[in-house]
Structures are given as C-alpha cells and as structure tokens.
Amino acid sequence: MRIRIVTFGLNIPREAYAAHAEQIASGFAAWPGLLGKWWLGDTASGTFGGVYLFASRHDADRSRETDLFRGMFADPALGGVAVREYDVLEAPTAITAPASRG
C-alpha cells in the first residue's frame, strides 16, 4: 500500500472550499486503486489537504496523471501545495489498522 499526504493553504473562505470539496469528491472516489481519502482542515493553522490510501505504488503513480491531481497545482484557490508519499509498513499496520488488511 501507498500513502499520500497533500497539504496546502486556502486563498478562499473555508466554507467555499468545503462546498467545492463535496462537489469533486466523487472524482477522487473513481480513481482505480484508491482505498480511501480523508479530507483535512485546520482553520487555526490555515492548513488543509488530504490523506490518500492507495492499494499500490502503481495506483498512486497513475493518479498523478489525472486532471484532479494536476489541477491542485494550478488552482488559484490553493496555495503552497505540498505532496509527500510513503510506503506502508504492512506487518505493523495489520496489527494497528486491521481494516486495512483487505
């Protein structure tokens, strides 16, 4: 499995972002191999983003070719987009997050 963590600041009100996120959520759900996406928002620090869980590195790599992924970097509503990806350590994760075992 592969984890992606995306963070950014907002150049629009939080409420406008939340409404937009609801509108585009189904697009992320259609990504092959995406097991889940958690939407992040911390108004106090101004940090927003998401945590994505992919079935494989290949699935994570394929998602980078989508309009949704590329659009984050061109969207004037989002500032300072940062993307980090990590492999999941399968054995300890199976103990602490048994639902991820598949």
Which residues make up each language-model segment?
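Short S/T/G/P-rich N-terminal loop/turn motif that feeds into the first structured element of a domain
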Residues: 1-48, 57-65, 76-102
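Short, polar loop motifs at secondary-structure junctions
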Residues: 68
